């Protein structure tokens, strides 16, 4: 992974309003691989049943997908995302999403993404497909 691309993505995540709102941190970034983390805050992310809102868990998944899919320095956008919600995290759980590229063609790339809590319990798993535009990321 080019250090210029890595630094640009790290800085973009630090500035991103969505990541700031949910306290998402980028822990690791390598070619086609990303690890992000947030603490599930029930005051921000509960649903009507006082459990984690699926959108909050998906937001963490999307952050891992977004960062892993940009590592070649070009814009990639989501084409398809399939999420299985396996378990609901406990309140204030530290959630970690890890995205790994599993396939790549000239125009697409596939990613497996898993969300676990701090005890290693699987919260959600995801398969995502990105469209690779070939255009450079604008914040380089």
Q: Language-model features: where?
A:
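Hydrophobic beta-strand-centered segment that forms part of the acyl-chain substrate-binding groove
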Residues: 66-96, 101
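HotDog/MaoC-like acyl-thioester-processing domains
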Residues: 1-3, 90-96, 100-140
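Compact, glycine-rich, soluble single-domain proteins
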Residues: 48-62, 66
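Extreme N-terminal tail/first-helix region
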Residues: 1-16
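Catalytic strand-loop segment that frames the active site of acyl-thioester-processing enzymes
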Residues: 21-51
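A generic structural signal for short beta-strands and their flanking turns/coil linkers
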Residues: 20-22, 32-34, 75-81, 93-95, ...
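Hydrophobic residues in beta-strands and at strand termini
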Residues: 38-40, 85, 132
């Amino acid at each position: 992974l080019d250090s210029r691309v890595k630094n640009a993505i790290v800085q973009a995540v630090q500035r991103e309003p969505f990541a700031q709102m949910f306290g998402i941190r980028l822990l690791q970034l390598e070619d086609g691989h990303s690890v992000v983390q947030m603490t599930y805050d029930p005051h921000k992310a509960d649903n009507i049943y006082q459990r984690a809102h699926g959108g909050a868990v998906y937001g963490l998944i999307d952050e891992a997908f977004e960062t892993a899919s940009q590592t070649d320095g070009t814009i990639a956008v989501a084409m398809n995302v399939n999420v299985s919600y396996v378990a609901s995290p406990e309140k204030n759980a530290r959630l970690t999403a890890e995205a790994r590229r599993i396939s790549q063609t000239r125009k697409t790339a596939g990613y497996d993404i898993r969300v676990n809590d701090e005890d290693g319990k699987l919260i959600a798993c995801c398969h995502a497909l990105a469209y690779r535009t070939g255009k450079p990321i604008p914040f380089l």
